[in-house]
């Protein structure tokens, strides 16, 4: 698909999705030609989407990135969610050779030392497994919301991901956190217990802290960096330096 046609399809989808509810948005994507993949980090937004996919038995693959540095609570929630909705959540792991190359170059926790080292860690533990999860997909469904951070304030319902050659679908783009929480309570959706301990946004354990009163939702992610740097690269294009020079290039 050309750049122009990808962008045109994304714009048309964005306009159609806006008037639908969550179930309708997901059903529309599930009915399109091409493979649809939802990647979940098991956060509260993602649990809302997973529940909708499971309850409505939609033809959407659910996948998660097992980085090797997740909270125990997150790991436990994967199996609980599978059992609750009778679905399979496919696990994608980093390559052992990539981890070894990262540790040799930066150290196990080198991500605290520089933005380059942190991006490199995300590249190995998230971006490369993500590439495998999305291989051959036409539509990538995410839990992005406009209220999560300033970087995401203009998130559309559908957008062309030219780098990956697919369309990214953000069915919760217009939901605020209060709506999310009310929906979770009403539908008895299982969520990460860390949300109740001051963690509205949860990533890898070494890179996530509880937020302070009045802080933005994602203030606890990579808190030692400037706000504009606080993305892992899944939803923001990364610099070439994010990939370890001597690491395995296997997808």
UniProtKB/Swiss-Prot annotation:
Location(s), subcellular: Cytoplasm
Record protein name field: Adenosine 5'-phosphosulfate reductase
Pfam family, one: PAPS_reduct
Pathway entry: Sulfur metabolism; hydrogen sulfide biosynthesis; sulfite from sulfate
Organism lineage: Bacteria, Pseudomonadati, Pseudomonadota, Alphaproteobacteria, Hyphomicrobiales
UniProt-annotated catalytic positions: 232
CDD domains: PAPS_reductase
Domain of life: Bacteria
Cofactor binding annotation: Binds 1 [4Fe-4S] cluster per subunit.
Residues at which [4Fe-4S] cluster binds: 121-122, 204, 207
HAMAP family with a match to the protein in the record: CysH
Reactions mediated catalytically: [thioredoxin]-disulfide + sulfite + AMP + 2 H(+) = adenosine 5'-phosphosulfate + [thioredoxin]-dithiol
Principal subcellular localisation of the protein: cytoplasm
NCBIfam families assigned: APS_reductase (TIGR02055), PRK02090.1 (NF002537)
Gene: cysH
The EC number(s) this enzyme carries: 1.8.4.10
GO MF annotation, one: 4 iron, 4 sulfur cluster binding
Sequence similarity: Belongs to the PAPS reductase family. CysH subfamily.
A Gene Ontology term for the protein's cellular component: cytoplasm
Cofactors (names): [4Fe-4S] cluster
Function (record text): Catalyzes the formation of sulfite from adenosine 5'-phosphosulfate (APS) using thioredoxin as an electron donor.
GO biological process, one term: sulfate assimilation, phosphoadenylyl sulfate reduction by phosphoadenylyl-sulfate reductase (thioredoxin)
Assigned keywords, A-Z: Cytoplasm, Iron, Iron-sulfur, Metal-binding, Oxidoreductase
């Amino acid at each position: 698909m050309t750049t122009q046609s990808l962008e045109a399809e994304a714009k048309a989808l964005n306009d159609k999705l806006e008037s639908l509810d969550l179930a309708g948005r997901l059903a529309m994507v599930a009915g399109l030609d091409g493979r649809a993949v939802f990647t979940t980090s098991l956060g509260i937004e993602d649990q809302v989407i997973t529940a909708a996919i499971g309850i409505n038995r939609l033809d959407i693959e659910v996948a998660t990135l097992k980085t090797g540095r997740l909270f125990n609570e997150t790991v436990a929630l994967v199996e609980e969610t599978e059992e609750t909705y009778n679905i399979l959540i496919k696990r994608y792991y980093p390559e052992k050779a990539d981890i070894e190359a990262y540790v040799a170059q930066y150290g196990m926790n080198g991500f605290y030392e520089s933005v380059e080292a942190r991006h490199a860690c995300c590249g190995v533990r998230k971006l490369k497994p993500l590439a495998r999860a999305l291989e051959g997909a036409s539509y990538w469904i995410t839990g992005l919301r406009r209220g999560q951070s300033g970087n995401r304030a203009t998130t559309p319902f559908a957008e062309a991901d030219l780098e990956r050659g697919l369309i990214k679908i953000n069915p919760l783009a217009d939901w605020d956190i209060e709506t999310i929480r009310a929906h979770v309570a009403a539908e008895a959706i299982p969520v990460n217990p860390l949300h109740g301990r001051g963690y509205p946004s949860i990533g890898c354990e070494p890179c996530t802290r509880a937020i302070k009163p009045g802080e933005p939702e994602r203030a606890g992610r990579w808190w030692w960096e400037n706000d504009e740097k606080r993305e892992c690269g899944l939803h923001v294009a990364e610099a070439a330096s994010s990939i370890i020079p001597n690491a395995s290039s296997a997808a």
